Amino acid sequence: TTTLYFNTPAATSEEVEAEVNDVTTDFIFSKDDVTTDIVSLTSADVDFTANLTLSFSQTSQNVDVITLKKGFSIEMALEGQTQPNGLVFELGDSENYGIKAGEAQTIEFKHDQEIRKGETLKIPVHFKRIQNFPEGQGIYQPGHFKLQTNVIANGTATTPGVPAGNIQVNLITDTEVPDITLQSVTGIVDPKIDINVDPITVEGIPDFLKDDVNLDLENPYI
């Protein structure tokens, strides 16, 4: 949540602007029932859609609508990331939003977007891949997966004619995240696999390794 200050020395019927500069909100996505056969992750292919939501509440005079202007941007980045493009995603509403040129983790508004009092603006974000996990994220302990994400907003907000003075509005950023599905992973796995010779069979392969997976066995022994 950030407070927008719409300042005007006299009552006006013109739009009044407020700047949003590097306003950061932190979110944690977690999953606590990951198979313990996965020891660590380098990357994970995922398939889930999260809604990035924007709404507002007023702390002083009545405001019925604010407008986030064309070019408003929202960056989504892993907390503490040291390599770029940790989050790979597509946008569900490409008519109104796009990926900012040269910044693969930044959503840019193609048009002005109104947020009316009591309503919520939703931006669907379809996540495809997560990679370059910072320390303490991904599989941070057996069976537990976590992402800590920074959402960083920049741009201009406006509101229609207001009385003289300082109009304060709280801009609220949030996310709606369903259950996260890890479709495939690159990393270290440590399943218990039984190998019987004559004929050669491999048994006890966990579900997540059964379909179209090639195994490189390092230092196998019988």
Predicted feature residues:
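Extracellular/secretory-pathway and virion-surface proteins
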Residues: 1-222
